[in-house]
């Protein structure tokens, strides 16, 4: 089992009190670093944030900022941006200058109106500001490859990362998008459309929640290996980033399951594992080892 020396997780969720716990598990698993998306689950939705006039939520990341300050070699973070925040440009500039602030995230896949806005250019002002400030942007907008293609063409200087394999799991599809579930063949055909985004050199793919999206266990992982092979063949290992989404795994798999299913994959060369399990993220986010 080949193992890269520098494993970096592209997405974990932690909140108050979670830094020491995350470090202990990372040390046990041999994970060198992780990108934090601070998002608290349970209680009030979308915490932490400041609530602005008109119901606009301004996400903040106090735990992630603290983690990056205390352990700059182990943690960096992204910041979510509300597309309706009137001060979005200032927030993006502040993140650009913040220690450990590496990227932005938007989530138009959370509701049908947001999906429609993404497809029709309603997020373009955020994309433009991200590109102007040199910040990569992760977008959670599953089942919407045409909207990603439009954005990639409109903003060729934007480093755009497709979240979570670019497709919904059926549970997310029926709840978030209010769409009917898809069979396995339909899901794979949709994923092929996502892979066509590899034609845009400014687009990368986050390999996260794959076990839920394709309904196959992360460990041992044999069912996912051919699908990941297709992704690497399309994008190249330099544009595929592994993410555990630790603490919010839809199938209840532990961090070790999610990592070791990748490490045990015989379809990836040692060099490809090095890229997918860390080097791609560091390269795209300008995060030195």
Which sequence ranges carry the predicted segments?
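Mid-to-C-terminal alpha-helical segments outside catalytic/metal-binding sites
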Residues: 1-10, 16-33, 37, 230, ...
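Hydrophobic faces of well-ordered beta-strands that scaffold small-molecule active sites
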Residues: 7-12, 34-36, 75-79, 102-106, ...
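Active-site mouth loops of central-metabolism enzymes
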Residues: 9-17, 76-85, 112-117, 178-183, ...
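Conserved, mostly hydrophobic/aromatic
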Residues: 11, 26, 95, 130, ...
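Active-site environment of divalent metal-dependent phosphoester hydrolases
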Residues: 15-17, 41-44, 84-87, 110-113, ...
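Short, acidic/polar
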Residues: 16-26, 85-96, 190
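Active-site gating/metal-coordination segments in enzymes
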Residues: 47-143, 150
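Catalytic pocket-lining loop regions of alpha/beta-barrel enzymes
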Residues: 116-241
